[in-house]
Design a protein with these regions (language model features):
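A structured beta-alpha segment of the ubiquitous adenosine-cofactor-binding alpha/beta core
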Residues: 1-7
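Short glycine-/small-residue-rich Rossmann-like dinucleotide-binding loops
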Residues: 6, 14-15, 185
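Short, Asp-centered acidic motifs that coordinate Mg2+ and/or phosphate
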Residues: 8-9, 89
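Beta-strand-loop-alpha-helix segment that lines the small-molecule cofactor/substrate pocket
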Residues: 9, 15-67, 82
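Predominantly a Rossmann-like dinucleotide-binding segment in NAD(P)-dependent oxidoreductases
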Residues: 66-162, 291
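Contiguous beta-strand/loop segments that form the cofactor/metal-binding neighborhood of enzyme cores
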Residues: 126-217, 251-267, 281-284, 299-317
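Glycine- and charged-residue-rich phosphate/anionic-cofactor binding loop of Rossmann-like
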Residues: 239, 260-277
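Active-site loop of classical SDR/Rossmann-like NAD(P)-dependent oxidoreductases
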Residues: 242-254
């Protein structure tokens, strides 16, 4: 594959621990790389990857591209045009029992570079950065529900493996351009509550679809317009936001990168965006360890968007 002159972009779907190693091999072969998230497991190796790509005139794209789907992008446009007023804060939740209940070999999901924060956090942090811009500082508390887990399915069922990372994290985020967020990431909860992204502004609260999907229901709840006097029911206006754009699936980010290369313009899910998300997630880990606020060193100048008329099914290449 790396020696095939007809291949311009290679997709890296390896485990997090070798993301950078494999991506560097792809760059060394003279090809652009689209990598699974996170871009790497450390800042140093991830920055090195971006520097090598820049020196070679090659591009790095980083998942998740779910946030480029009509769900998050429609909500982003609604917020940008002032539909909820000035964004103030966000709340996100991802909690469940853990991937060992369905995955035949889940140990890597509890190893360095994964866990609920590094595995699922990229979806939620990416969505928040699309709305609020770059993250300035974070605080967090973490815990480990159990030092080991047990595989539930497949040939390895019954086998125990170690948990190397916090399995629950409670997170606060402060954004450079204003706004705050609180997030919960957990694989210790029997109660399934995932895909919750709510952003409150001065004139309403918008509910965004699960950032691990490409679309879904979008609603805005308006403030009460008259005094609430019990026992009369408290009724609030809930407005549906029409989702704009063509719904497809994974590969949208890769397609945007390929089209952008052909058109000589920036793609949306850049390596720099992926690095800022990683830097934020690693800062959250450090904040949980120190039980303090940690400044996020990286930033990004501009967060790109996909236009509502982006059609992934159009023949353009």
């Amino acid at each position: 594959m790396l020696n095939d002159p007809e291949i311009d972009i290679v997709v890296n779907l390896t485990i997090p621990a070798v993301h950078v190693e494999v991506s560097e091999a792809i760059l060394a072969a003279g090809k652009h790389v689209w990598t699974e998230k996170p871009i790497g497991v450390s800042r140093d190796e991830s920055l090195r990857l971006l520097q090598k790509a820049d020196a070679a005139g090659l591009r790095v794209g980083v998942a998740p591209d779910t946030v480029l789907g009509p769900g998050v992008q429609t909500a982003k446009r609604a917020i940008a045009r002032g539909d909820i007023g000035r964004p103030l804060f966000a709340q996100t939740t991802f909690q469940w029992q853990g991937p060992e209940i369905f995955h035949p070999n889940p140990a890597f999901l509890y190893a360095k570079g994964a866990g609920p924060l590094l595995d699922m956090g990229p979806y939620y942090v990416s969505a928040l950065v699309h709305v609020f811009g770059p993250v300035a500082a974070v605080a967090a508390l973490g815990l480990q529900g159990s030092p080991t887990r047990t595989v539930q399915v497949g040939e390895l069922a019954g086998q125990e493996f170690p948990v190397e990372i916090p399995s629950t994290l409670s997170v606060l985020m402060d954004f450079e351009q204003g706004g705050q967020a609180q997030s919960l990431y957990s694989t210790d909860s029997p109660l399934l509550r995932t895909g919750i992204v709510e952003i409150t502004g001065t004139e309403g609260t918008i509910v965004i679809p699960d950032p691990n999907t490409f679309g879904g229901e979008i609603t805005i709840t308006r403030p009460l317009t008259q005094a609430f006097v019990p026992p009369a029911p408290m009724t609030q206006e809930v407005v549906d936001v029409v989702q704009e754009g063509v719904l497809s699936g994974r590969g949208v980010g890769l397609l945007d990168m390929a089209r952008s290369i052909a058109a000589d313009r920036p793609h949306v899910a850049t390596g720099e965006f992926g690095y800022h998300v990683l830097d934020t997630l690693l800062s959250i880990e450090e904040a949980a360890e120190s039980r303090s606020f940690v400044q996020v060193a990286s930033t990004i100048d501009e967060v790109g968007s996909l236009d509502a008329d982006f059609d992934p099914f159009e023949a353009t290449l």
